[in-house]
Amino acid sequence: MSEATTASEKTLMVLEAAMTHERFSEIVTAVNLPKATVHRILATLVERDFIRVADGGGHVPGPKILSLAGVAYDRVDVSTIVQPYVDDLVRRVQCTVHVGVLSGDEIIYLVRTDSDKPYRMPSRVGAAIPLHTSAIGKAILARLDDDAIERFVNRAGLPRRTARSLTTLEDLRAELADIRRDGYAFDREENVPGVVCIGTAVRDHTGHSNYGLSISSLALEHTEGQLAAMADDLNKAAADITHALGGDR
């Protein structure tokens, strides 16, 4: 490793630590570098507006880093980022895989990738579906507390999509408890008759579960137990996508 590379790595280490630690002593501990080195790097970062010294003396993100973050976020194409992980999951489970994004009280499909099965799911990219009738939606709801769930129900209602849709707050809460325990959610023909899914939530750089990943099949082809057997592959892909979107696995 060259001296230039070593210096670059030290600068990046200090910059990253300063994003999550305000106090100088905390930054030093996080990077495990000599105080003099950290002080010198911080001074350069402050001079270049990557770091700002707050009124209380703490280190906070400066205007340059905020500007770069905004530019980077504007250039993010989530569909492109997640597609390799979706393709890998499709190969593993040989089923249709969806990625959806939370939009108000609905899920919008961003990605749909089919397997080589002779049939196709009735879903389409850009379609909106209710949270309470979809595996992705219920997985996201399961990350909320009881008060937030009650506000959601009061606001959006629980309209019936099929004979199997959950239409009461009591039933929804009971299922969300199961989802929290298991780490994944089912759609038991609740959105489209004959279509079943297993899904889980995906966190992004905000730390919130704004996305979700699901595996879809026909009720005639896969039992609930067979879908549950895909949970490990599903959760691994979701963890990889979470990391790719800047979230913690």
Where are these regions (language model features)?
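N-terminal helix-turn-helix
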Residues: 1-80, 87, 239, 243-247
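Short amphipathic alpha-helical signal-transduction/dimerization elements
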Residues: 19, 137, 141, 145, ...
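A structural signal for short hydrophobic beta-strand segments in well-ordered beta-sheet cores
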Residues: 51-52, 99-100, 202
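A cytosolic small-molecule/anion-sensing beta-strand core signal
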Residues: 55, 103, 211
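All-alpha effector-binding/dimerization core of bacterial HTH-type transcriptional repressors
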Residues: 70-118, 143-147, 155, 172-178
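Short, solvent-exposed recognition segments
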Residues: 119-191
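Cysteine/selenocysteine-centered motifs that mediate thiol-based redox chemistry or coordinate metal-sulfur cofactors
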Residues: 151, 156-157, 238-249
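Extended hydrophobic
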Residues: 168-238
